[in-house]
A protein has these predicted regions:
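Phosphate/diphosphate-binding loops
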Residues: 22-88, 273-302
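Short, compositionally biased leader-like segments
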Residues: 88-126
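Generic long, charged, amphipathic alpha-helical segments
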Residues: 172-265
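C-terminal structured "cap/appendage" subdomains that terminate the fold
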Residues: 247, 251-291
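Short, basic/aromatic recognition patches
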Residues: 117-142
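Short beta-strand scaffold segments in enzyme catalytic cores
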Residues: 142-150
Length: 303
């Protein structure tokens, strides 16, 4: 969760960060890059969260957060000027592993090595790809990240194969988009339903287990009016409207199947290290769909 200067921007970005995956953000730990003010604290107060870390808190914000979870909410203040040691060390069963700290710096030339026929990388695409790289820098490998409009919308982390990362992140990106469909926005929930229950209900409604909330005797628990089934054809038609999505990968794509899956979720821009013996196949698949792909030459593994 990122926070910018200014109360309104801070709140907006906090909400967007959590909205990337409403299911996984349940019981999260919130990280803010600026001082937490009263308005942001009020937003955090209503969320199911285990803690927050920020470079500072206003007096009003601190009083609000101190009362959360009956005083057991974890509130951490960090020194924004702190510089970690240049060498990272990890002890595993008596063996010490050392490596240089990840100091990835993304500048205007970071995505300049475009290897596809389409080389039109927009400014928004550069921003989105940069966000994907930053997200991957701190995400358990193997990982893939989908980004749209300055917001991560699907993160697939900790998988044992690249294609499973792409599928997992893609399914989350699809769910993010489906939640904005007319079918979901038009749902009439019963009065007093808790937000977490509403999120879970939507997740079931847009998924394969929709009858869990639409069966007779069940739908009445969640809705005032029984919704129509959100058919596979309707979902596909809505997903096809999601375009200009950016995708980053923390290591190279070994085969073009990752690009095929990414295309189904509206991906147009791709950034990955490159270096696979099948790079030509991956590039050809991107060219088939008119995608723009950059080879960064940098692997972002995090274990």
């Amino acid at each position: 969760c990122a926070c910018l200067v200014g109360s309104e921007m801070c709140i907006r970005d906090s909400i967007r960060a959590r909205g990337a995956d409403r299911m996984s953000s349940f019981g999260d730990f919130i990280s803010l890059s600026d001082v937490c003010d009263k308005s942001t604290a009020l937003v955090i107060k209503r969320e199911v969260s285990d803690g927050v870390i920020a470079p500072g808190y206003t007096d009003e914000a601190l009083e609000i957060l101190k009362a959360k979870k009956k005083g057991n909410y974890c509130v951490i203040e960090i020194d924004p000027s702190y510089e970690p040691a240049p060498i990272e060390r990890k002890d595993v069963f008596g063996i010490t592993f050392e490596q240089g700290r990840n100091e990835l710096h993304i500048d205007d030339d970071f995505f300049s090595n475009i290897v596809t026929e389409n080389k039109e990388l927009t400014e928004q695409a550069k921003i989105d790809l940069a966000i994907s790289m930053i997200t991957l820098k701190y995400t358990q490998s193997n990982s893939v990240c989908y980004v749209k409009g300055g917001q991560a919308i699907g993160i697939g982390a900790g998988q044992q194969s690249r294609i499973h990362c792409t599928r997992l992140a893609g399914s989350k990106a699809d769910n993010w988009w489906l939640r904005q469909s007319p079918q979901v926005l038009g749902l009439q929930f019963v009065d007093g339903i808790r937000r977490a229950d509403r999120d879970n209900t939507i997740d079931l409604y847009i998924g394969e287990d929709y009858m869990d909330v639409l069966a007779e005797g069940e739908w009445q628990k969640f809705f005032k009016v029984k919704p129509d089934v959100f058919t596979a054809e309707e979902k596909r038609a809505w997903l096809d409207k999601n375009t200009d999505v950016a995708l980053g990968s923390d290591a190279f794509f070994p085969f073009g199947d990752n690009i095929e899956r990414a295309h189904k979720s509206g991906v147009k821009y791709v950034a990955q290290p490159g270096g696979s013996v099948r790079d030509d196949h991956v590039i050809d698949t991107c060219n088939k769909y008119g995608m723009v792909m950059s080879f960064t030459g940098i692997r972002l593994f995090h274990h």
